[in-house]
Amino acid sequence: MSIISDSLKKIKPSPTIAVTQKARELKAAGKDVIGLGAGEPDFDTPDNIKQAAIKAINDGDTKYTAVDGTAVLKDAIVKKFKRENNLDYTTDQITVGAGGKHVIYNAMMATLNEGDEVIVPAPYWVSYPDMVLLAGGTPIILECNEKQGFKINPAELEKSITQKTKWIILNSPSNPTGACYTEGDIKEIAGVLAKYPHVHILSDDIYEHVTYEGFKFFTIAQIDSLKERVLTMNGVSKAYSMTGWRIGYAAGPKEIIKAIAKIQSQSTTNPSSISQAAAVEALNGTQDFIKERATSFQERRNFVVKALNEIDGIECLNPDGAFYVFPSCKGLMGKKDTSGKELKTDTDFVQSLLENSGVAVVQGSAFGLEGFFRISYATSMENLKKALEKISSFCKSLN
C-alpha cells in the first residue's frame, strides 16, 4: 500500500515552478542563464506598503486574525470593487486567503463533488486542472487557438456544457497568453451562460491592472443577471509587486464564501496579519505605482513581440495585458539543433533552448496547447535584449 494518496497521483508538479527551479540550479552551478519563466514582477513592493507592514509589526499586530481576513482588509476590498468595478458587496461576501491560488483551491475544495465538471479554457494557468482534480472534479479542456486570439468561442463553450458542469474558469488578462476579453466578448459568453443557471463562473482577475493602450477592463460580475453565480478572484501580488506577501481575495455568493472559510479554518487559518495590513495600504493608498509599472511593461511587450516576429519560424500575437507572450514555435518543428537532436515538440524546443543558449522559457503544452512557448517579460530590458538575441541565434542555428 502506497503512503501517497490516490488523488495526489492524478496531478503533476507545477511546470512553471520546475522551469524556474531548473534555471536557479544552473545559475548556482555557474552557468549563465536568463530566466523568463517566472510569473512575478521584477519591481520592488512600493515603499508605502512596506512601511504599513513595519508599522503593523511595531504596533504588535502579530496575532491570529479572523480566519478569512480582518474586517479592515475586507472593507478595503469592498471599496476596491465599488471604486474600480462598480460592484456592490458586503464584507460577508468577501474572503481573504494566502494568495489567489489559495483562494481558487479553497473554492474548488468547497464546491466540487466527484464527477462535477469544470470548463477550463486552454491555454490555461497550469494549476487550474490539477486543483480541479485534487478536489475530485473533472477538468473539461476547451481549446482556444491563436486564430481566436486564444479566447473562448461562445458556440464551442455551449457545446462543452453538460448537466455535470459546475464551474467555468475565466482568466482575463490571461496567463499564459496575455489575451484580454472586451466587454463585448464577456457579454457574448454571458449570453451562453444565461441559458445554464446551474453553471457558476470563477473569474480570475489577478492581472486586472496589467493592461495596455487604453484597454478597458471588464469583469463578468458586472453583468447583473450573472453576479449571483460569479466568484471574482483578485489579489495584490501582480498589481503591487507583492507575490511573496501571499494575499489573494474573492467576492461572491455568501454560501460559497462561508464554505471557503470553513475549508480555511481547517487548513491554514488566517493569512499573515502583517501581509493583511500591507494589503490594506495597497488597496487604500496611492495607485500611482500601477500606472508607472504598466508603462514599463508595455515598452517591454512591444520590444519582445517585435523581436520574436523577426525570427524565422516564430510567430507572436500582440497581447493586450498581463506580462507574458505566447509565441508559436511550430515553424521550427522537424529541425535539428547543433547536437543533432530533432525538435519534435515544444518541450524539445524549450529544453534545447535552455541547454544550448541558457534561456529558460515554459513549453506551451504545460498550459494545454502544444506548439507554443511562454515568455515572461517581467524582467529588465537588459535581460530581455540578451535573451532575445540568444533565442534568435539559437533558432538560426537549427537546420
Give residue spans per PLM region:
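PLP-dependent class I/II
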Residues: S2-I4, K12-S14, V19-K22, L26-V33, ...
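Substrate/cofactor-recognition hotspot
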Residues: L8
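Flexible nucleotide-interacting loop at or near the entrance of a catalytic core
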Residues: D61
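Conserved N-terminal alpha-helix of the aminotransferase class I/II PLP-enzyme fold
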Residues: Y64-G97
